[in-house]
Amino acid sequence: GNNPTLYSYVLDTNFWIDLFGLKIIPTVTRGSNNEILTASATISRTDLGTGSATNASSRTYARKLGNIDDDAGHIIGNQLGGSGGKKNVFPQDFHVNRGEFAKFEGNVAEFVNLHGKADIKITFEYANGGTRPTRIHYEATAPNGDKISNSFNNHH
């Protein structure tokens, strides 16, 4: 997984439990309001299908950053090996999260499976300021340079 240390199994056991540190936690840059600006990770074929669902704590966290009916959207999707903990979620409109975003993550999983791995880069826009993104840009790049990308509004 993306655990940056060699000697610990999880980064913070208060957020999630991952006994072997195998879930994907993206590298994230944040703005002055603690809003997510960018996220990146490398997903390998072996990561596919190893992610975890969100939990009550991560859903509460995401809704405090966004709307009361928002999903805790995975930055790196569950099907791509992403953790459901607080360090890998953002406030996402549930229609988008369960619809076009989930479908695109399935396309990314197929892309990773085809190419063996992919570098993921995600950029979040905040047209209204605050901590709930209004638009998400998602790009996956294979080792040979092939790319797939999409952009999503965070409303329906």
Language-model-derived ranges and their functions:
Residues G1-K23:
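Short turn/helix-capping motifs enriched in Asx and small/polar residues
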Residues P26-H156:
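Domain-level detector of nuclease and nuclease-like folds
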